[in-house]
UniProtKB/Swiss-Prot annotation:
Disruption phenotype: Compared to wild-type mice, mutant mice fed on a regular diet show a remarkable decrease in body weight, food intake, fat mass and plasma lipids. Blunted response to Asprosin, including attenuated cAMP levels and hepatic glucose production, as well as improved insulin sensitivity. Mutant mice show significantly reduced food intake in overnight-fasted mice compared with wild-type mice. Male mice display decreased fertility caused by impaired sperm motility.
Organism name: Mus musculus (Mouse)
Family assignment from sequence similarity: Belongs to the G-protein coupled receptor 1 family.
Sequence ranges on the Cytoplasmic membrane side: 47-57, 119-142, 226-238, 292-313
Effect seen on changing residue 186 to D: Reduced affinity for Asprosin
Glycosylation sites per record: 5
Name of the featured protein: Olfactory receptor 4M1
Tissues with expression: Highly expressed in liver but not in adipose tissue. Also expressed at high level in testis.
PANTHER family referenced in this protein's UniProt entry, alphabetically: OLFACTORY RECEPTOR
Gene: Or4m1
């Protein structure tokens, strides 16, 4: 997508997370460790669910899709951020900025919708166990996942369409380590009140509505489970799982609401919240959603033994 004709800015300067060399090196080691955990673990999750016939239920199909989105979500900002720790002048082209913005909102919104679908899956499994296979059949799962991706795509197109029509004539400095609408809109050479309101309505509304829907669904599930708390270990595990999922929901939607559901003014906490939103959240997803699952862990060990250590068991 090309900028408007009156656009003179061809690149943006990113301020990064810190200007201190020692701090940059520490952050590089930390974020590289996170990224090198996120990529192989999520790839292993996808391969395990794909290759193990015992993990064919809708829940695991949704987990594989979540792992795929996490790979892309973490890869939108992390590689450039890691390279920029060693670059004096951190720049990104106008086209690169628009691409980063597009994929950030595409994958991020898709993940929000997918988390909502996963909450519905948990509701069906816990509250309608006898009808679960009928309700959450493979066809419905594919439709819900496709709708999640489509919703994310439409949302992202709206953000990009609003940005590319704005004129940029300087300054061109973005006070962050990646491109996002909250920084880009602030440096446009025009009155952006209408665009800002549409973006807040779009991004903020998605975040708030999904967040409230998820909290209500998990509150309902916890109420149902605690009524049957005498059922034994399986109920205790389900309650623990719900609390873990609520943690992810808060960590995902809290920063998103803070960033997008308010006027796009600059605050001192913006960069810290952005780190939680783009780095910490993809790190915790596989830990809480998948690696606490005994069936998945057993299947992963089996897969590693078979294909890496060449052992059948």
């Amino acid at each position: 997508m090309e900028p408007a004709n009156d656009t003179t800015v061809t690149e943006f300067i990113l301020t990064g997370l810190s200007q201190t060399r020692e701090v940059q090196l520490v952050l590089f080691v930390i974020f590289l460790s996170f990224y090198l955990f996120i990529l192989p673990v999520n790839i292993l999750i996808i391969c395990t669910i794909r290759l193990d016939s015992h993990l064919s239920s809708p829940m695991y199909f949704l987990l594989a899709n979540l792992a795929f989105l996490d790979i892309w979500y973490s890869s939108i900002t992390a590689p450039k951020m890691l390279v920029d720790f060693f670059v004096e002048r951190k720049i990104i082209s106008f086209g690169g900025c628009i691409a980063q913005l597009f994929f950030l909102h595409f994958v991020g919104a898709s993940e929000m919708f997918l988390l909502t679908v996963m909450a519905f899956d948990r509701y069906a499994a816990i509250c309608r166990p006898l009808h679960y296979a009928t309700i959450m059949n493979r066809r419905l799962c594919c439709i819900l996942v496709a709708l999640s991706w489509t919703g994310g795509f439409v949302h992202s197109i709206i953000q990009v369409a609003l940005i590319v029509r704005l004129p940029f004539c300087g300054p061109n400095e973005l006070d962050n380590y990646f491109c996002d609408i909250t920084q880009v809109v602030r440096i446009a050479c025009a009155n952006t009140f209408l665009e800002e309101m549409v973006m807040i309505f779009s991004s903020g509304l998605i975040s708030v509505v999904c967040f409230i829907a998820l909290l209500m669904s998990y509150a309902f599930l916890l109420t149902m489970l605690k009524k049957h708390s005498s059922s034994g270990e399986s109920t205790s595990r389900a309650i623990s799982t719900c609390y873990s999922h609520i943690t992810i929901v808060v960590l995902m939607f809290g920063p998103s609401i803070y960033i997008y559901a308010r006027p796009f003014d600059s605050f001192s906490l913006d960069k810290v919240v952005s780190v939680f939103h783009t780095v910490i959240f993809p790190l915790l997803n596989p830990i809480i959603y998948t690696l606490r699952n005994k069936e998945v862990k057993a299947a992963m060990r089996k897969l590693v033994n078979r294909y890496i250590f060449c052992k059948e068991k």
